[in-house]
């Protein structure tokens, strides 16, 4: 399985810290980047994804979850730009780290959707992982990352990751 996101080598500003203010909510970028999928294994029914900043550990003490989504149709070929907000029919989305009491947001449009990179201290590498699954997962909107991992456990046919950079 392959995934492709346009980045040279940085994620486009529109999807990260330097997004125009009209593409920010509570100071954070909300337009999700397009993701292209190919060589999906036969037998895959759905895809799931995680977008996580492990470089956040020295800053806040834990890996920062920017996006989780599940039950994306395996046949889709591409998750289009801004799908997190405009194509919610294509997936269910979980909570990101802004849902934490440490971050303090309670706006569902911030905590239950893509919230793009805003590295505070240096350029960060963000890990996008896509999973091909043999089933639709029994998750509700606003699920937690650990629930996604638990539900996927016996259903992963393939998994692939890429790192995307965002500038400070």
UniProtKB/Swiss-Prot annotation:
CDD domains according to UniProt: PEBP_bact_arch
Domain of life: Bacteria
Pfam families membership: PBP (PF01161)
InterPro entries cross-referenced by the UniProt entry: PEBP (IPR008914), PEBP-like_sf (IPR036610), YbhB_YbcL/LppC-like (IPR005247)
Cysteine pairings via disulfide bonds: none
Protein name, UniProt field: Uncharacterized protein YxkA
Naturally occurring in which organism (per UniProt): Bacillus subtilis (strain 168)
Lineage of the species this protein comes from: Bacteria, Bacillati, Bacillota, Bacilli, Bacillales
């Amino acid at each position: 399985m392959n995934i492709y996101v346009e980045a040279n080598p940085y994620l486009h500003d529109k999807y990260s810290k330097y997004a125009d203010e009209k593409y920010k909510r509570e100071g954070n970028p909300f337009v999700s980047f397009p993701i292209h999928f190919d060589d999906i294994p036969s037998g895959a029914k759905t895809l799931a994804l995680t977008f996580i900043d492990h470089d956040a550990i020295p800053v806040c003490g834990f890996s920062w979850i920017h996006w989780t989504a599940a039950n994306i149709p395996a046949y889709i070929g591409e998750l289009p730009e801004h799908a997190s907000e405009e194509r919610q029919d294509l997936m269910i989305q979980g909570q990101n780290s802004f849902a934490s009491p440490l971050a303090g947001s309670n706006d569902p449009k911030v905590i239950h959707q893509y919230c793009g990179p805003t590295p505070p201290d240096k350029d960060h590498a963000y890990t996008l992982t896509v999973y091909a699954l043999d089933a639709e997962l029994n998750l509700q909107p606003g699920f937690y990352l650990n629930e996604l991992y638990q539900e996927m456990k016996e259903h992963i046919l393939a998994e692939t990751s890429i790192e995307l950079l965002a500038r400070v």
